[in-house]
A protein has these predicted regions:
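Alpha-helical cap/lid subdomain in secreted, periplasmic
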Residues: 69-142
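Catalytic nucleophile serine of serine hydrolases
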Residues: 7
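Short hydrophobic segments within beta-strands
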Residues: 2-4, 122
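Conserved SGNH/GDSL esterase-like catalytic core that processes O-acyl groups on lipids
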Residues: 2, 11-100
Length: 142
């Protein structure tokens, strides 16, 4: 499974999924390609410019191999992935106009490199009513 995301993918994949797979003795290879706070627009910019700005953790049998300075294309070429997840930044996840054209272009690129992979969407969780995140007012605190 390859996750293309930000710190939320780090939380969900490295802190939750990897230990569950290890505990259940399910063989799984996880690639977590992340850039803190990364939006779909930023992922798209990194893709277009082929920017090696990501941290990439390769996890196999519970062993994490960290890599810095990875590009999205590098991760897509690394191996045949069964599942690939994409994710919007939490501060943009409720803003419909923040998805396109970036998401469609990212999907097209993923499909070009990994035509047999199942695409997944990692939905971030909402902020609490008393959240102090600077982007939270965009949602009228709801």
């Amino acid at each position: 499974m390859l996750c293309i995301g930000n710190s939320f993918s780090w939380d969900a994949v490295e802190q939750e999924l990897a230990p569950l797979c290890d505990a259940g003795k399910q063989p799984i290879i996880i690639g977590n390609l992340y850039y803190g706070g990364c939006s779909l627009e930023q992922h798209h910019t990194f893709l277009i410019k082929d920017t090696a700005a990501y941290s990439f953790r390769y996890i196999e049998h519970g062993v994490r191999t960290p890599n810095e300075g990875y590009s999205l294309r590098q991760a897509l070429r690394l191996m045949q992935w069964d599942y690939i997840s994409l994710q919007q930044a939490s501060h943009d996840s409720g803003i419909q106009s923040s998805y396109e054209p970036y998401l469609s272009d990212l999907i097209d690129t993923v499909r070009a490199y990994q035509p047999h992979a199942t695409l997944c969407w990692m939905q971030t969780w909402s902020y609490s009513q008393d959240a102090k995140h600077p982007e939270y007012p965009r949602y009228q605190k709801s």
